Every structure is written in structure tokens, then in C-alpha cells.
From Swiss-Prot:
Subunit organization: Homotrimer.
Region described as Linker: 230-250
Sequence segments annotated as region (Pyrophosphorylase): 1-229
Chain residue ranges for the region called N-acetyltransferase: 251-456
Organism superkingdom: Bacteria
Gene3D superfamilies, alphabetized: Hexapeptide repeat proteins (2.160.10.10), Spore Coat Polysaccharide Biosynthesis Protein SpsA, Chain A (3.90.550.10)
Name of this protein: Bifunctional protein GlmU
Length: 456
């Protein structure tokens, strides 16, 4: 039976000794963001009125990393078990709300599973998430009588008979705030570990005649925890496989789903094709018929219809209109903007630069702090010299300009419409419309020149 209000407690106090890291375990990343952030996001989507985060090791780093989230920070100075952690948060529980208990190192838990758990919670009872494992070694076993859940026995405290039980506790549960506070106050640490187990509340609830409803997740991997980097890497692959499956079923062509990483949010149009070893980070939008070549990295960018990004290009915080072509081996840095039909070729770098409609920068070029008009040709080896060691300056190039190879444009400088800049020119002054600009060192010819030779 569903109460109108619900808050969430996320346990995140563990150090994560087996990670062999100075970083708190829950801050290690999965799919580009901290594990605990996945759990916070799930709690938020579920509509939690408040999220209590129980922390201990690395508290300052946790607070700094999660500063944008609305959290109630609860200190667990000593790690004396899950029950002890919940006792620290208990003073913040309202009597008339449900409390959902989650873990910062169980990052794949889904909103759908949590909603089913919330819906299944009996009035005055407990909703408990359990799974059945072929090898339940090390996990707390679910004990039942006549099919009803009666308690949870930790592996270290279980009898040989109880250790044969395959149904195990995931640690995720939901109960009423008033009931939970009462049960937490009755817990003891009379067990092999000398800790306060949250699992003891199951037996306490059963003794009061309360119903415990067990719910299974859609996928066992939803409840997998992380204690070491091997487990984290396995969950990463599970997560990525799930994301790839969703994209394929929605019409996106992933040439090799096992070699695709989504570390953010991807929105795709129709007939999008993505080759192997592509990484998507942040918020990315791909229009209709976009093609992404092998080995590309796309981050926080919008790619318009019919664009093609050739292999091993990096696109970050950029905006491409329709029918642009990029790469191979191109780099678009933050602030790069390409208008319709523009082309950026191999070993071209753009930053805070706008390339107009139909304009081309085909090879070996740096365009920084630049505004480039339509139908402009940027020759190979062109550089906008935008930095004097202290300040950045802008280069403006008008429509229909032809820039020859090996040109340096020393900003601030403006090149007028229709101008032609000869190869090898260093432009230091503004150029008027339709002018030809060239700078040359006199070419010297020496007949009969004897090339120096090495002495033996």
C-alpha cells in the first residue's frame, strides 16, 4: 500500500578498501558518472521528498562532487553496520512517510524495480527486494515459514541448513518511518561481526505480525554491488550492453554493440549509423541519417541531419548544422560551430570558431577565435594566430574568401569579402574586399651550388 510521501536513505559511508584508491568507493565512475550519482538520480526520478546520504570516509570530496544535488548529509563517524547507518539517519524520518533504503555502490538499480517495490509494500509492513542465486555464498539468506518471509540470516551466522537457501537479501527495502524508527531502536549487535544489521528488522516486524512482501528485480544485475574494480568493470559492460540494446531496438545502427560506450544521454534521429569504438559523453543529439566513424568521441554536442564524422575525430561542445563533414582525425573544441555543408578535414582543429555555409578547411589547420563566412576556402597549414601570450584576439574572414596554403592570420585582423590571400602569406593588417594579398621573401637562385657533404 503506497503512502503519499517517501524519502530515500543512501548508504555511502564505506571506504572501499578493495578498490585500492584514495577516492571514496561510491565516487568511482560507471558510464561517466559516480556510482552514487546513478542511485541519487533513481531516487529523484522516483519522486523522493528528501534524499538522506549517509557518509563517512572522504566526506569533503563527496560533498564537493555532489554539491549540485539536494541532499541531507548524515555523518556515520564509525562504520558499525547497515543498521547503525540507518540509526544515524532515523532522527530525520517523518512518522507518516515511507523510507526507502538504497546503497551508493549498487548503481544499476532501476526506477521501475523500485516503483514495484514501493507499490508492493504492505500497510504497516516491509517491502523487501530479494533475488535467487545459484551460488548464494556470502549473502544473507531469506527465511520463510509457509511461504511467508520471517527473517534474514547473515551467512556468517547461518546454520548449514540455512546456507542451502538460494533466496538472498539485496539490502534494499522500504518501510514506514515510525515503524522503522521503532525497529531500529530495538536492534542489537549480538552476532558474529559485532555489528548492527538492518536485516534484524525483518524478524522484529514478523514478531509484531507485520507482513513482509518480497519483490524480485527485473534483472539480477540491478542489485549487484561493487567492492573492487573487477566488479565495477563488469557492471560497466552490463550497463553498456543494456544501453546498446535500447539504441538498436529504437532504430540506431551500432556496427559493433560490444564496442560502444554511452556515458551520458543520446538522442538520435532516423537511420543513424555508429561504427565501432565510439564514445558518447554528456548530452548529445544526432539528427537524421548521421554517420559516426570508428573511434570518434562526441561530447555535449548537436550534430545536424546528414552529417558525417569520419574516424578518430573528437567533437566537444560543438554545433553542426545539416550536411557537414568532419575528419578523419579532426578536433572540434568548445565553441566550434559549422553551418550547413561546411567541411573540416584531417588534422584540423577549431575552437570558439564559426565556419560558414559551404566553407572548407581541408587539412592541417588551426582556427581559433574566428568568424569565417560562407563559401570560404581555407588552405592547408593555415593558422589563426589568436594569442599573444596574455590575451586572445579574433579573426574575421568574409564570404567567398580564398586563403592559400601556409597562411598565418595575426589577430586581430579582418579579411573582406572576395579577397584572395596567396600561399605563404602572413597577414598582419586588415584586407579590403576583393583584394589580393601576398607577402614574399625574394627568391634567390645560385647556379652551380655545391651541397655540403659530411666528412668521413
Amino acid at each position: 500500500m503506497l503512502n503519499s510521501a517517501m524519502s530515500v536513505v543512501i548508504l555511502a559511508a564505506g571506504k572501499g578498501t578493495r578498490m585500492y584508491s584514495d577516492i571514496p568507493k561510491v565516487l568511482h565512475t560507471l558510464a561517466g558518472k559516480p556510482m552514487v550519482q546513478h542511485v541519487i538520480d533513481a531516487a529523484t526520478k522516483l519522486g523522493a521528498a528528501q534524499v538522506h546520504l549517509v557518509y563517512g570516509h572522504g566526506g569533503e570530496l563527496l560533498k564537493q562532487t555532489l554539491k549540485d544535488d539536494k541532499l541531507n548529509w548524515v555523518l556515520q563517524a564509525e562504520q558499525l553496520g547497515t543498521g547503525h547507518a540507518m540509526q544515524q539517519a532515523a532522527p530525520f524520518f517523518s512518522d507518516d512517510e515511507d523510507i526507502l533504503m538504497l546503497y551508493g555502490d549498487v548503481p544499476l538499480i532501476s526506477v521501475e524495480t523500485l516503483q514495484r517495490l514501493r507499490d508492493a509494500k504492505p500497510q504497516g509492513g516491509i517491502g523487501l527486494l530479494t533475488v535467487k542465486l545459484d551460488d548464494p555464498s556470502g549473502y544473507g539468506r531469506i527465511t520463510r515459514e509457509n511461504g511467508k518471509v520471517t527473517g534474514i540470516v547473515e551467512h556468517k551466522d547461518a546454520t548449514d541448513e540455512q546456507r542451502q537457501i538460494q533466496e538472498i537479501n539485496t539490502g534494499i527495502l522500504i518501510a514506514n518511518g515510525a515503524d522503522l524508527k521503532r525497529w531500529l531502536s530495538k536492534m542489537t549487535n549480538n552476532n558474529a561481526q559485532g555489528e548492527y544489521y538492518i536485516t534484524d528488522i525483518i524478524a522484529l516486524a514478523y514478531q509484531e505480525g507485520r507482513e513482509i512482501a518480497a519483490v524480485h528485480p527485473a534483472r539480477i544485475s540491478e542489485t549487484d554491488g561493487v567492492n573492487n574494480r573487477l566488479q565495477l568493470s563488469r557492471l560497466e559492460r552490463i550497463y553498456q550492453a543494456e544501453q546498446a540494446e535500447k539504441l538498436l531496438l529504437s532504430g540506431v545502427m551500432l556496427r559493433d554493440p560490444a564496442r560502444f560506450d554511452l556515458r551520458g544521454t543520446l538522442h538520435c534521429g532516423m537511420d543513424v549509423e555508429i561504427d565501432a569504438n565510439v564514445i558518447i559523453e554528456g548530452y548529445v543529439t544526432l539528427g537524421h541519417r548521421v554517420k559516426i566513424g570508428a573511434g570518434c568521441i562526441i561530447k555535449n554536442s548537436v550534430i545536424g541531419d546528414d552529417c558525417e564524422i569520419s574516424p578518430y575525430s573528437v567533437v566537444e561542445d560543438a554545433h553542426l548544422e545539416a550536411a557537414c563533414t568532419i575528419g578523419p582525425f579532426a578536433r572540434l573544441r568548445p565553441g566550434a560551430e559549422l553551418l550547413a555543408g561546411a567541411h573540416v578535414g584531417n588534422f584540423v582543429e577549431m575552437k570558439k570558431a564559426r565556419l560558414g555555409k559551404g566553407s572548407k578547411a581541408g587539412h592541417l589547420t588551426y582556427l581559433g577565435d574566428a568568424e569565417i563566412g560562407d563559401n570560404v576556402n581555407i588552405g592547408a597549414g593555415t593558422i589563426t594566430c589568436n594569442y599573444d601570450g596574455a590575451n586572445k584576439f579574433k579573426t574575421v574572414i568574409g564570404d567567398d574568401v580564398f586563403v592559400g596554403s601556409d597562411t598565418q592570420l595575426v589577430a586581430p585582423v579582418t579579411v573582406g569579402k572576395g579577397a584572395t590571400i596567396a600561399a605563404g602569406t602572413t597577414v598582419t593588417r586588415n584586407v579590403a574586399d576583393n583584394e589580393l594579398v601576398l607577402s614574399r621573401v625574394p627568391q634567390v637562385h645560385k647556379q652551380g651550388w655545391q651541397r655540403p657533404v659530411k666528412k668521413k
